[in-house]
Amino acid sequence: MLSSLFLPLPESPAGFEELKNSGSYFVDKTEYIKTVFTDSATVLLFTRPRRFGKTLLMTMFESFLKINKDKPFDTSLQEKYFKGTRILEDTEFCKEFMGQYPVIEISLKDVDGKTYDDAYKMFASTVSSVASKFKYLLDSNRLDEKEKGGISRISDIAFLREQENSDYLKNSLRILASALYREYGKYPVLLIDEYDVPLANASYHDTTNKKLYSNDKSFVADYHENMVTLIKGFFGILKDKNTLTRTVLTGC
């Protein structure tokens, strides 16, 4: 009897579309979309503890904004997933934003390793996975060969995991943003989930390794320093002008 009265609860962390497809409870926070994307700031950071719904919020942003690559500017998918939510009541905002922007969404939650080399490879794998979603741009007649070459490189996991190619990793967001602007004529929205994880993990491992190798005078704790250099280059796009429509980051 009770099972017919209540919806199921989500059993594990899920993205917005997965949650909607599951028929589970969903607390309508779609009005946050307008709050965030009409804010005067072009870079916003949300800091909350784990399990506070940051990832769900970011995937909701992505689902609402992203252009349908098969039918650009068609909003039928958004109308499906956001049916019955408050944001659809704001027709003017939806007309301007819903399904109208290319979106780059990346989570850095898995960037970890006991050594910098291991963490670098995880970082490269994460970026390559995201870049591979945009390989359809290789068939575009709007991109030149240099732009297509950049996408091919950052989509190639074996190539990107080699540290001698770290400049491609550092510039991967610029490569994607430039290609998406060329394709759609709109600067993309950048969503970075758990932006602080790589540096937090690097700091932890440096502290641990200092204790572990305290008697080894040749040991140098440079994991965190190397990660700072990598992150600085990767996030460099946030300082560029006329590259992104808006950037949203989450972290603890």
What are these model-predicted stretches?
Residues 1-252:
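Phosphate-binding site recognition
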